[in-house]
UniProtKB/Swiss-Prot annotation:
GO terms for molecular function: DNA (cytosine-5-)-methyltransferase activity; DNA binding. It holds the Pfam family DNA_methylase. PROSITE patterns: C5_MTASE_1, C5_MTASE_2, SAM_MT_C5. It comes from Desulfomicrobium norvegicum (strain DSM 1741 / NCIMB 8310). This is Type II methyltransferase M.DdeI.
Amino acid sequence: MNIIDLFAGCGGFSHGFKMAGYNSILAIEKDLWASQTYSFNNPNVSVITEDITTLDPGDLKISVSDVDGIIGGPPCQGFSLSGNRDQKDPRNSLFVDFVRFVKFFSPKFFVMENVLGILSMKTKSRQYVKDIIAEEFSNVGYKVCVIILNACDYGVPQSRQRVFFIGLKSDRPLNQQILTPPSKVIESEYTSLEEAISDLPVIEAGEGGEVQDYPVAPRNKYQENMRKGSTCVYNHVAMRHTQRLVDRFAAIKFGQSVKHVSEEHSQRKRGDANSISGKVFSQNNMRPYPYKPCPTVAASFQSNFIHPFYNRNFTAREGARIQSFPDTYIFQGKRTTMSWEKHLSQYQQIGNAVPPLLAQALAERISWYFENINLINDSNVSIKRMVQRSFMSQLNLENNVNVRQDDNYDKVHSF
């Protein structure tokens, strides 16, 4: 099936669908560096580097019949394009452009990704944002269900919960359990941070290079998967740190952050190295446990985390591994940016992305839905029995993954 990707970022969402056999025919992303990353890794896809609010879908020279699905994650920050409007009303946000494209292309399905907080968000008039979203899609002929997925359930070495609004045309049966991809691993076999990055070159602060050789062979299935088709390591450069910062990192133990260090290693006021800063962000400089999935990698992960074993922040490649980007996926633009620079750094691109393995699981589930639409329409078929039967058909047994069959009934909602 053909898809178009709105608010495409660097392409994590699209890449997951590609791994599931979909064909991306168009991506729209206004940030130059993220767009360059997308184009570099998807040379056969038409990428438009423009603000989506300025685009008319009728001018894109894409036939409506060629579009089977639309995916994307419109940013929820601010939820407003006008200062006098309700900032939390999605009808005042970029969300309306997602609806606009869905209305024009009339795809078989759409998937819209967002953060967990959107489910509890209300407007000034006390309406739930999620209800308004469902209503707006209903107005253009779609039913919506909402599922909450955690990336670590799908082989990603990261605990990352995200919300997915899945839309189908109103004449299609919509069942939440059927559209929820089955978990691919049990909790005791989650991919850990150490399993994800332990084969990468050992570097200290300020070391590394844009292209390096692998120092060792893959040590596990995850590393084998990430290294398929890759002959070297890209984007593995560690940031430079002052000695004061390196000493602070050395004082932080697993599970601790900057808030746990002694006064000797506390953050200092900007421009005054002798005065302790009154502001301490507990999420900064956190040293994650190596033998568990990493906590959520956000756009600010360059300062959020330090390596579990070395006294430095993660590299962009380590972040990409944690997000399940393959090593063949090479990031463009600067590694980091200053506050006044307008483009998205490699770290920001990676942290903003939908993990490809998570996207792949969702894409495979949608494919399964359309392949079994006749059975789903049959009211004599037990939904629960059908869901359980489908778990085994969705598995890649060659990768020796395990199934959890009892947890897919409490993380879905429908409208």
